């Protein structure tokens, strides 16, 4: 007796098959806007305690799928687990965000270990296995890492900064030392992503949250080239792996990013100019995005209009509906449902 094959819309669009109604998910879809997430977070304790408890991490990954039926689940974790697995001190202070011991001089960079200890990330891989087992068959599981540049900004400064000046200054003043950090992160990210694929991830996303602070020449060196090396390194072992890049704020550098990195899809923020993206990018790769997270808080007619704009702007090619960045904690659940209903009803 032959079973019917289950279609995964998210994987289908990344494989070249345009969907009439775009598949959708939200960055940070497992998060504080959900009461069920807050309940698990309270049980777990600290943020990293939640990341490194496989059962809890899998549970919060699954929560938005159960509630909204999104087409993709992204494993609950954080981009800074990579420096943690490189032996760096990583902690999350309440109300202050991540804190690391800064690598703010060439001498300190020389102490950076070159080999990632994947055993420190076993909980992430266990969470992927649990999640893959529990997901509906039509739902795609996404694994991820931060881009080397974005992760390096936290490692150099020891915390987040508005314009990432500490990392940029090191890249200008001590390019050899900064390149060492990037090289270590490239190799570590390749190993980490391959291990996620082995554990059940079906698609990968590379988050370059701070790419937009770089001028064009530095963007090519510190965003495009490291991403290209990661994509190449993953596919050397796992040919055909579908990979999405998110060079937030890339602007006019977006076409170069797509052309040179080899990604299958590119996520865009809400400031991207639609006609530019359609003309220069969407004919080559899947476009993912790009609803402003703040209009999702507003709701009402403003949300309907913004959703319609995104759908119409990218209906002529392959598109994954998403936000332009992560959902905000104060977002009403009813507004997510409003957005979801409108996207599902669209037939491009």
Curated annotation (Swiss-Prot):
<dbReference type="Pfam" id="PF01208">
    <property type="entry name" value="URO-D"/>
</dbReference>
<protein>
    <recommendedName>
        <fullName>Uroporphyrinogen decarboxylase</fullName>
        <ecNumber>4.1.1.37</ecNumber>
    </recommendedName>
</protein>
<dbReference type="InterPro" id="IPR038071">
    <property type="entry name" value="UROD/MetE-like_sf"/>
</dbReference>
<keyword id="KW-0456">Lyase</keyword>
<keyword id="KW-0210">Decarboxylase</keyword>
<feature type="binding site">
    <location>
        <position position="325"/>
    </location>
    <ligand>
        <name>substrate</name>
    </ligand>
</feature>
<feature type="binding site">
    <location>
        <position position="209"/>
    </location>
    <ligand>
        <name>substrate</name>
    </ligand>
</feature>
<dbReference type="InterPro" id="IPR006361">
    <property type="entry name" value="Uroporphyrinogen_deCO2ase_HemE"/>
</dbReference>
<keyword id="KW-0627">Porphyrin biosynthesis</keyword>
<dbReference type="GO" id="GO:0005829">
    <property type="term" value="C:cytosol"/>
</dbReference>
<comment type="pathway">
    <text>Porphyrin-containing compound metabolism; protoporphyrin-IX biosynthesis; coproporphyrinogen-III from 5-aminolevulinate: step 4/4.</text>
</comment>
<feature type="binding site">
    <location>
        <begin position="28"/>
        <end position="32"/>
    </location>
    <ligand>
        <name>substrate</name>
    </ligand>
</feature>
<comment type="function">
    <text>Catalyzes the decarboxylation of four acetate groups of uroporphyrinogen-III to yield coproporphyrinogen-III.</text>
</comment>
<feature type="binding site">
    <location>
        <position position="78"/>
    </location>
    <ligand>
        <name>substrate</name>
    </ligand>
</feature>
<feature type="binding site">
    <location>
        <position position="154"/>
    </location>
    <ligand>
        <name>substrate</name>
    </ligand>
</feature>
<comment type="similarity">
    <text>Belongs to the uroporphyrinogen decarboxylase family.</text>
</comment>
<dbReference type="GO" id="GO:0019353">
    <property type="term" value="P:protoporphyrinogen IX biosynthetic process from glutamate"/>
</dbReference>
<feature type="site" description="Transition state stabilizer">
    <location>
        <position position="78"/>
    </location>
</feature>
<dbReference type="GO" id="GO:0004853">
    <property type="term" value="F:uroporphyrinogen decarboxylase activity"/>
</dbReference>
<keyword id="KW-0963">Cytoplasm</keyword>
<dbReference type="InterPro" id="IPR000257">
    <property type="entry name" value="Uroporphyrinogen_deCOase"/>
</dbReference>
<comment type="subunit">
    <text>Homodimer.</text>
</comment>
């Amino acid at each position: 007796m032959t079973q019917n094959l289950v279609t995964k819309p998210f994987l289908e669009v990344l494989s070249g098959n345009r969907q009439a109604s775009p598949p959708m998910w939200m960055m940070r879809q497992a998060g504080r806007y959900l009461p069920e997430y807050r309940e698990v977070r309270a049980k777990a304790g600290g943020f990293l305690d939640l990341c490194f408890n496989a059962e809890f991490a899998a549970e919060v990954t699954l929560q938005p799928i159960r509630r909204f039926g999104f087409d993709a689940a992204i494993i609950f974790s954080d981009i800074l687990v990579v420096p943690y697995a490189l032996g760096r001190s990583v902690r999350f202070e309440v109300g202050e965000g991540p804190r690391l011991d800064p690598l703010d001089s060439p001498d300190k960079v020389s102490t950076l270990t070159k080999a990632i200890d994947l055993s420190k990330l076993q909980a992430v891989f266990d969470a992927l296995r649990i999640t893959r087992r529990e997901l509906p068959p039509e739902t795609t599981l996404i694994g991820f890492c931060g881009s080397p540049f974005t992760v390096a900004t936290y490692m150099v400064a020891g915390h987040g900064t508005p314009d990432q000046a500490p990392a940029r200054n090191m890249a200008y003043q001590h390019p050899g030392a900064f390149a060492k950090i990037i090289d270590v992160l490239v190799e570590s990210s390749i190993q980490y992503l391959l291990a996620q694929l082995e554990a059940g991830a079906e698609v990968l996303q590379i988050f370059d949250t701070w790419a937009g602070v770089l001028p064009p020449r530095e963007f090519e060196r510190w965003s495009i080239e490291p991403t290209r090396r990661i994509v190449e390194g993953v596919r050397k072992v796992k040919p055909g792996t579908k990979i999405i890049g998110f060079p937030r704020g890339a602007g006019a550098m977006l076409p170069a990013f797509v052309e040179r990195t080899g990604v299958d899809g590119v996520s865009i923020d809400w400031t991207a100019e639609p006609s530019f993206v359609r003309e220069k990018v969407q004919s080559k790769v899947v476009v993912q995005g790009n609803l402003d997270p703040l209009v999702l808080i507003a709701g009402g007619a403003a949300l309907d209009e913004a959703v319609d704009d995104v759908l119409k702007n990218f209906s002529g090619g392959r598109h994954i509906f998403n936000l332009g960045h992560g959902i905000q904690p104060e977002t009403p659940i009813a507004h997510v449902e409003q957005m979801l209903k409108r996207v599902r009803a669209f037939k491009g």
